[in-house]
A protein has these predicted regions:
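Structural/interface elements that position substrates and couple domains in central-metabolism enzymes
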Residues: 1-183
């Protein structure tokens, strides 16, 4: 999801889809339909879209992806968790779909909550990961400034060996980036 100048998420593409549904969908029975939003949104955006679609009977759900550029398919097939935010009557159907496809090779944990709680959870996960990347780079810089270049990997691996911390994202080098992590 691209950012606006103020740092918030640009959800104009989703807004365009909602506008198209309102423009072209009135002659159809949409009461058994759901709109599942997968991009990162600002807390409250999904509620706003649900309000706009309230007269159509469409249920809005929030199901953000946890993917990285360069490993999108692998990340989707091996998801650790699925967030599903929404209060609509079709939530159970969506959960059953996820259980059937299981995203690939392992069954992710599925977390059901309101759309706003899911929006906040997605942002919180992204913030935690960027903090972890920054922390690993800070430790690497301290070691480099102490002329301990050859021990950076050993130190970060040792820190990551603590199960409360883990090895993922405990690497010295490039910082975070891409469309999801600059905020």
């Amino acid at each position: 999801t691209p950012s606006l100048e103020n740092g918030s998420y640009d959800v104009s593409n989703v807004d365009d889809v909602v506008s198209d549904i309102l423009k072209y969908g009135w002659d159809k029975d949409l009461s058994n339909k759901s709109l599942v939003i997968g991009c990162t949104t600002n807390p409250g955006d999904c509620d706003f879209f649900q309000d706009r679609l309230s007269e159509t009977g469409i249920n809005v759900f929030y199901n953000p992806e946890f993917i990285a550029q360069g490993s999108i398919i692998k990340d989707l097939q091996n998801a650790d968790m699925v967030l599903l935010g929404g209060d609509g009557k079709h939530k159970g159907n969506l959960v059953n779909i996820y259980k059937k496809i299981q995203y690939g090779y392992k069954e992710p944990s599925i977390h059901l909550m309101s759309t706003k709680a899911a929006e906040i959870t997605k942002i919180a996960v992204n913030c935690f990961l960027t903090t972890k990347i920054s922390y690993a780079n800070m430790i690497g810089q301290v070691l480099a400034q102490s002329n301990l270049y050859d021990e950076i990997e050993t130190v970060l691996s040792s820190i990551g060996s603590d199960s409360r911390i883990g090895h993922k994202y405990m690497n010295f080098g490039f910082g975070f980036g891409g469309p999801c992590f600059p905020r």
